[in-house]
C-alpha cells in the first residue's frame, strides 16, 4: 500500500500491477488489463501472480464500507457484499472531452464526469444509476448506522 498518500479523498492506493502470465504482453491492452483484474479477483491469488509496476492500480476499500467513507471504491465493494458476492470489484472513471476550442487542438474543461453528468448519461442510455448517497441511505436502512469516534476512525 502507498504509505504516505497525499490524496485529498483518502483513497487507499496500492502498488500498480500487471498479471504475471505468459498471456500478458505490455499490460496496457484491454485484454491484459482484464486478465490482471481477473488475477487480482481470484480467491487464490498470490503476490507471485502479479508483476510490478503495472497498469492496474488496485485500491483498498475501508472496512466500514460507504458508511465509513463515501467513495467509489467502497460503493463498488458494498454492491458486491449486498449481492452476496466476494468483496472484489473493478471500477472505472467516466470522462468528458470538454468543448472544442475553435482553431486550436485543445478542449475546455476535459476531465472526470461528475454526478449530474453520470445521471444524465444513465438516463440517455437507459442505464440504472445509483448515487453513493442513496446507497448509504439504503445500507443504513437495512443495517445499523456506523458510529464514528471524534478522530474519524470507526
Predicted regions, residues:
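Catalytic domains of riboflavin
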Residues: 1-154
